[in-house]
Regions:
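Membrane-interface helix caps and helix-loop-helix hairpins in membrane proteins
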Residues: 113-120, 176-184
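Hydrophobic cores of alpha-helical transmembrane segments in multi-pass inner/ER membrane proteins
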Residues: 55-64, 132-139, 196-197, 254-267
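Alpha-helical transmembrane segments in multi-pass membrane proteins
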Residues: 16-70, 80, 88-93, 126-129, ...
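Small-polar-interrupted transmembrane alpha-helices in polytopic inner-membrane proteins
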Residues: 133-134, 138, 159-175, 193-196
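C-terminal membrane module of polytopic membrane proteins
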Residues: 218-279
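Membrane-interface helix/loop boundary segments of multi-pass membrane proteins
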Residues: 140-165, 201-209
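Central hydrophobic cores of alpha-helical transmembrane segments
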Residues: 162-170, 211-223
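Juxtamembrane helix-loop-helix connectors linking adjacent transmembrane helices
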Residues: 2-5, 36-49, 72-143, 150-156, ...
């Protein structure tokens, strides 16, 4: 008996999301469980399970688009276009994200809140590693949150409601961890919501393309990776850590929130709605 998956479109978005997640788990668990049981290296275990999860996520998206929405080019619908223009948007986003991080740390250095240090490792390797990590994180999270999830939300809700739900779920997803770790990192929640808003506005600014959000997300991760892994800074202690960032995480400090707020305000003012109208949505 052939199952008519197009009937899922008649159900509200929470039901569709649950069905998709259950299908993904059904595909992932048979491969993930043996890895958890047999692989002793925790780093290798995490890498293998995450790679398998994301490969199956992309595989399932293709089926979801064809069988549920009758859209054979679902990735283009999400804004993942392999075009020159989208590539330029990725580079623009990388530049904006990297510049934002460098300006934040540069300003704190000028104010005497941190001290710049000589790198403890070969900086060229860190820069290349950071670029790869940043692009990987940006691609994965933006296809998930500003591609699939945002599309599902916008099918049922008005644009501004979908915007806020997407941003909040994006922030909440970073707290799927033990309670102690949640409490430890909770101060970064406002900055993550602002980043989620920024990414949706960035996609709308570029008329639904994912290039800018992928690049911007990647650039932020890239910049922080270079400074953090390269051990380029040391806080002077002239101001409390809630100003510069609790646990040395700029997203957990007032300065990080202010910078993310400024970035959100700027990109939100630039974004273009699907109707070509300027302004925040």
């Amino acid at each position: 008996m052939k199952i008519n998956l197009t009937q899922l479109t008649q159900y509200p978005v929470p039901v569709r999301l649950v069905c998709f997640i259950l299908a993904l788990l059904f595909l992932w668990l048979p491969l993930a469980v043996p890895i958890y049981l047999l692989v002793k290296d925790t780093n290798l275990e995490s890498i293998l399970t995450l790679v398998i999860l994301y490969v199956e996520f992309i595989f399932l998206l293709n089926i979801w688009g064809k069988q549920v929405y009758q859209q054979p080019k679902i990735f283009s619908h999400y804004g993942l276009e392999f075009t020159r223009l989208n590539g330029v948007n990725v580079l623009q986003g990388l530049a904006i994200g990297l510049t934002t991080v460098l300006v934040l740390f540069g300003l704190e250095g000028v104010l005497g809140w941190l001290i710049w240090q000589q790198p403890q490792v070969f900086l060229g390797r860190i820069i290349l590693e950071g670029l790869l990590v940043g692009f990987g994180v940006g691609f994965a999270e933006e296809l998930l949150f500003r591609g699939w999830l945002l599309d599902e939300l916008q099918r049922d809700y008005k644009l501004n409601i979908a915007l806020w739900i997407d941003a909040i779920l994006f922030a909440v997803s970073h707290f799927i961890k033990p309670l102690e770790a949640i409490i430890h990192t909770l101060p970064q929640f406002p900055a993550l919501v602002l980043l989620g808003l920024t990414q949706v506005w960035g996609k709308r600014w570029r008329r639904g393309r994912l290039g800018l959000p992928i690049g911007l997300h990647g650039g932020l991760v890239w910049g922080y990776y270079i400074i953090n892994v390269g051990q380029l800074t040391k806080y002077s202690g002239q101001v409390p850590d809630w100003v510069t960032g609790v646990n040395n995480n700029p997203l957990q400090g007032v300065m990080g929130v202010l910078f993310m707020g400024g970035l959100a305000w700027w990109i939100g003012g630039q974004q273009v709605t699907g109707n070509g109208e300027q302004g925040r949505v």
